[in-house]
Amino acid sequence: MLEKAINPKGLVPAVEYKGKALYESLILCEFFEDAFPDNKPNLLPSDPVQRAVARMWLDHLTKTFIPAFHRLLQAQEAEKQHAALQELYESLRKLAGSIQGPYFFGESFSLVDVAIAPWIARDFVLEENRGYKRGDVSSGWKKYAEIVEVRDSVVRTQSVSSFFSVCQEFVALLIICR
C-alpha cells in the first residue's frame, strides 16, 4: 500500500516531494500554495494579514466545526443530538458572519471555501438524520452553501452523495435479506 509508505496513518491525500512525505489535506493545500506560488488562482490571499485571517478560520473549522459535525452525527440520544446541533449552528453562524460573499473572501474561491466544501456536500446526511437545516444557521449561510455546492470545481471532486446512496441501497438490501 503506497499510502502507508508515504503517510504512516495510511490515509490520503499523501504526497512524496523531493524525498519527503507530506500529508493532511489542508497542510498539502498550503504546501502547494508555497511551493508553486506562480500557479493561479491562489487559494490564500496575498496580503499577510488576510492570509493569517484565512488560517484562523481554517483553525476554527478544524477545532470547532468539524468536531461538532462529528458529535452531531454520532450522538444517539435526543438530548445529545440537540446539544450537538446547537454547537454546530453556533460554529457555522460564527463563520457565516465573516463571509464576504459569494465566497468567503468575496469573489475569490479560497482555501477556507475549499476546507468547508466537503462538509457542505455532506450536510444532507445531517439534514436527513439529525434535523439540521442550512436556513436555521442563517440566510447568509444557506446562500453561501448553495453557491459553494454547485461550483464546478466542487461538483467535479465530490462523490459523497453517490457514495451514501450506494451505502443506503446496501443497508436496504441487508434489511430485506434478514
Model-found features: residue ranges?
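A contiguous, mid-protein "functional segment" used to position or interact
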Residues: 137-166
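GST-like domain detector, emphasizing the conserved glutathione-binding G-site
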Residues: 1-104, 178
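Surface-exposed helix-capping loop/turn segments at secondary-structure junctions
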Residues: 97-107, 128-129, 152-157
